[in-house]
Amino acid sequence: MNTNDYPEKAFLLSGLSECGKSTAGMYFDSIGIKRMKLVKVLAYKEMKKNKNINPYEYAVELAKEKGEIFVAQKFIDNLTDICNRENTRYCSVESLIYRRNAEYIKSKMPDRFIITYIDMPEKERLKRQMIRSRVDIEEAKKIMLPRDKIKMSHGAHEIKNIADVVINNEGSLEELYSQLLKMSKKYCKLE
């Protein structure tokens, strides 16, 4: 790979359900760091051929058929291709949930890919689910906990141990934004 290839930096956002990955991605987008979805990056070329493809289903099937390492390399290749075509220097990508993918990506491009784990206690995440879905705590548990279980079966919670950055998202939205801004200034040269 040519060292001039984009992205210069990609923040790979990880964490359990309702931890703030999308909020972080939207904030990054607002300051000039392009927001992307991992499954759409994976299905990028297939979506150009077939507009009706479901990127989530495609990503799951690809992992089943080819394995996590193949998926991780395809992600790297597709993201590099997209960023070079669009002259994207910096991006954030949601949602990295496979521990083995994170390890592989980190081993291949540690200087470009910043694995970022957003940490939030379960009770706070449940509150967010209650607000988002307009339900009580029991219904929120029925919605969120099965999603957490799936993510944890892939090792999403273990990504925290290998992350380049761990963001504590227990505080206010302003505190989250402050941490993200500090991180972007450390890794990016934004204009």
What are these regions (language model features)?
Residues 2-8:
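Phosphate-binding P-loop
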Residues 69-70, 131-186:
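Small-molecule kinase domains that catalyze NTP-dependent phosphoryl transfer to phosphate-bearing small molecules
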Residues 11-12:
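Short hydrophobic/aromatic beta-strand immediately N-terminal to the Walker A/P-loop
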